[in-house]
Design a protein with these regions (language model features):
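Residues embedded in well-ordered beta-strands within globular domains across many folds
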Residues: 26-28, 69, 146-149, 177
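A contiguous active-site-proximal alpha/beta segment in oxidoreductase catalytic domains
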Residues: 90-92, 97-175
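Redox-cofactor-proximal catalytic regions of oxidoreductases
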Residues: 19, 125-126, 183-185
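Short, small-residue-rich loop/turn micro-motifs
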Residues: 6, 31, 152, 180, ...
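Glycine-rich, aromatic-lined ligand/substrate-binding cores of catalytic
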Residues: 169-193
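Short coil/turn segments at secondary-structure boundaries
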Residues: 52, 148-151, 187-192
């Protein structure tokens, strides 16, 4: 199961759906507007449509799932990861794996206690092009390398300063806030763009 249907989660949905060793059975997202696109992306790659839910806890409780992918906003990485490991599921979680050191320590404790695998994703370090570049540097072909710098530019433009607004229909904003301080809804805090 995948928790999240936009941003990094959408990209992860694509990757796992193309993997012959994985099947995305259910996608959870508390914004119902994001689910149709995620389902379609998975269907095109995997040939079957995943179920959807607005509450990630349904994935935690589903005994047919053996692993959970956590592609939520940063402040929601640790809690579902810990819950999944307690429920006997392995976890792939996006970076950062936790919002603070205490959450990180609790994740490690859950992983050890329940003997689960918990991997934090770091897609740029894991890509073929980065691995190829690193292998080339290690050959010594460039001489002794003391520092390497890289950057990535995005041409999406400025996000602006939208005013706070009403929560979109169907969105469980209280759940989205979770343990974070409750603030008025703002599209830049919620989805960015």
């Amino acid at each position: 199961g995948v928790i999240g249907a936009g941003g990094r989660a959408l990209s992860l949905n694509r990757s796992f759906a193309e993997n012959a060793n994985a099947e995305i059975v259910t996608i959870a997202d508390l914004d119902p507007r994001r689910l149709p696109r995620a389902v379609e992306e998975v269907y095109r790659r995997q040939g079957s449509k995943p179920k959807t839910t607005g509450d990630f806890r349904h994935l935690i409780d589903d005994n047919s799932l053996d692993a959970i992918v956590v592609g939520t906003p940063d402040h929601w990485h640790a809690i579902p990861s810990i819950m999944a490991m307690i429920a006997g599921k392995d976890v792939y979680v996006e970076k950062p794996d936790s919002h603070n050191i205490v959450e990180g320590m609790r994740m490690v404790a859950a992983m050890k206690k329940h003997k689960r695998i918990c991997q934090m994703g770091s897609q740029h370090r894991s890509t073929t092009r980065m691995q190829t570049a690193l292998a080339y540097i290690k050959t010594g072909a460039l001489g002794r390398c003391l520092v390497a710098k890289a950057w990535e530019s995005s041409r999406q433009g400025a996000i602006g300063f939208p005013k706070d607004s009403q929560v979109p229909a169907g969105v469980n904003y209280d759940m989205w806030c979770g343990a974070a301080p409750k603030r008025p809804f703002n599209v830049n805090r919620f989805h960015g763009r």
